[in-house]
């Protein structure tokens, strides 16, 4: 009798633990963040293609798309472009691009986007082709139509403030319901490389609202992971589906952050004697490069520390290549040879260990994430059916 009673107690303890775990997984906020980096966006595109393929395999559904699994997808610069591609709906209200379509997009359009304008007083590239192709691909779609919450950053040089385009901001700031092609060009309009972007929307009163925007990297310095987390936190507080989540409860956040590559020496190394001969333009190029790399490192350091402090280190995965060399470090080298190298970088990265202390490869970690994303989606669907 005592044995039976002990067994029943143990059974119900396991059942309670299992139910608690399922509830936590069901209420997890899933976040995808994609760095900026110009043509180096090919690297995270390879990672996204692998992840989407895993989700299709796990769920036995060739039509599965990343937007079906993430509550928030954030990006800056080229990461903002990827965000738009996988969240903007087509005529069937499905993402107009599958992850496997992104690399071919770079190969087809990259050489035209990064086609030197020949100007010695303006930006290196006139941006006309970039804006044209964005208009063709994204059409008249606006932020509110995105298939999941988005977080795309830019910076307004007239107001001197960051501008964050998200669906959840629209009730308070309807002027942020801009066309996706305007947002994508703005987040990619890196100073020196592309002209700033001017466009207008309207306020709730019908008044004209002006935007004068440059690259989102000015606002997030290349890595939008913290921005994406903050949007996810607000979403969790406002959406009844996440009622158990407290502010900044990273235990119930699942974050995948994709980099566009750097190296341990911040892309390039310089000596004091070398830098002493630089003029203003050379310094601007170097500072942008150094700042992006340093900020990306510090963002990763902060987020990983916070997740570890909350015993949730497995909820955060940063996928980054830290050993780029030669032309692969350049954000605007869209030669076919360099793009092929970037594809190789992404494919090789999948086979590399996540850290020096872990034998788990990025490929294995992404498979683990795919299983979590799939299980969570099924739990959500089961709850909705009751």
Curated annotation (Swiss-Prot):
UniProt KW keywords: Glycoprotein, Hydrolase, Lipid degradation, Lipid metabolism, Plant defense, Signal, Storage protein, Vacuole
Pfam families linked to this entry: Patatin (PF01734)
GO MF entries: monoacylglycerol lipase activity; nutrient reservoir activity; phospholipase activity
Motif (GXGXXG): 36-41
InterPro entries for the chain: Acyl_Trfase/lysoPLipase (IPR016035), PNPLA_dom (IPR002641)
Compartments, record wording: Vacuole
Free-text note regarding domains: The nitrogen atoms of the two glycine residues in the GGXR motif define the oxyanion hole, and stabilize the oxyanion that forms during the nucleophilic attack by the catalytic serine during substrate cleavage.
Signal peptide: 1-23
Protein name: Patatin group M-1
Short motif (DGA/G): ranges: 215-217
Reported function: Probable lipolytic acyl hydrolase (LAH), an activity which is thought to be involved in the response of tubers to pathogens.
The protein's Enzyme Commission number: 3.1.1.-
Residues carrying covalently attached carbohydrate according to the record: 115
Motif mapping: GXSXG: 75-79
Coiled coil location: none
Active site location: 77 (nucleophile), 215 (proton acceptor)
A single Gene Ontology CC term: vacuole
More details: Patatin have a dual role as a somatic storage protein and as an enzyme involved in host resistance. This tuber protein represents approximately 40% of the total protein in mature tubers.
Predominant subcellular localization, coarse grouping: other
Lineage top rank: taxon: Eukaryota
Distribution of this protein across tissues and organs: Tuber.
Biological process, per Gene Ontology: defense response; lipid catabolic process
Record organism: Solanum tuberosum
Domain PNPLA: 32-229
Gene3D superfamilies in alphabetical order: Cytosolic phospholipase A2 catalytic domain
């Amino acid at each position: 009798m005592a044995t039976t009673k002990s067994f029943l107690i143990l059974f119900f303890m396991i059942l309670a633990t299992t139910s608690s775990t399922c509830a936590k997984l069901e209420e997890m906020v899933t976040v995808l963040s994609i760095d900026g980096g110009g043509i180096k966006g090919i690297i995270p595109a390879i990672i996204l293609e692998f992840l989407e393929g895993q989700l299709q395999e796990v769920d036995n559904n060739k039509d599965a798309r990343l937007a079906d699994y993430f509550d928030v997808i954030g990006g800056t610069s080229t990461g903002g472009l990827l965000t738009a591609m996988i969240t903007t709906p087509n005529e069937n209200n499905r993402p107009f691009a599958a992850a496997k379509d992104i690399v071919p997009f770079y190969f087809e359009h990259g050489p035209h986007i990064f086609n030197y304008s020949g100007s010695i007083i303006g930006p290196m590239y006139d941006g006309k082709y970039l804006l044209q192709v964005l208009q063709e691909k994204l059409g008249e779609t606006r932020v509110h139509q995105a298939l999941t919450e988005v977080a795309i950053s830019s910076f307004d040089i007239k107001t001197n403030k960051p501008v964050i385009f998200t669906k959840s901001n629209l009730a308070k700031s309807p002027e942020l319901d801009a066309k996706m092609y305007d947002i994508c060009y703005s987040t990619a309009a890196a100073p020196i490389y592309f002209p700033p972007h001017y466009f207008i929307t309207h306020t709730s009163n019908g008044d004209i609202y002006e935007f004068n925007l440059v690259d989102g990297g000015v606002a997030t310095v290349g890595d939008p992971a913290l921005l994406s987390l903050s949007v996810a936190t607000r979403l969790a507080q406002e959406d009844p589906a996440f009622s158990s989540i407290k502010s900044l409860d990273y235990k119930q956040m699942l974050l995948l952050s994709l980099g566009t590559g750097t190296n341990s020496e911040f892309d390039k190394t310089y000596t004091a004697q070398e830098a002493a001969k630089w003029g203003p333009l050379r310094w601007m190029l170097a500072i942008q490069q150094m700042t992006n790399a340093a900020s990306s490192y510090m963002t990763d350091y902060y987020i990983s520390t916070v997740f570890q402090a909350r015993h949730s280190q497995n909820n955060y995965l940063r996928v980054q290549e830290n050993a780029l060399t030669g032309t692969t470090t350049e954000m605007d080298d869209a030669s076919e040879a360099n793009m092929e190298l970037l594809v190789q970088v992404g494919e090789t990265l999948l086979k590399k260990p996540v850290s020096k202390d872990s034998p788990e490869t990025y490929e294995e970690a992404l498979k683990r994430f795919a299983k979590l994303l799939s299980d969570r989606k099924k739990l959500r669907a089961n709850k909705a059916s009751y």
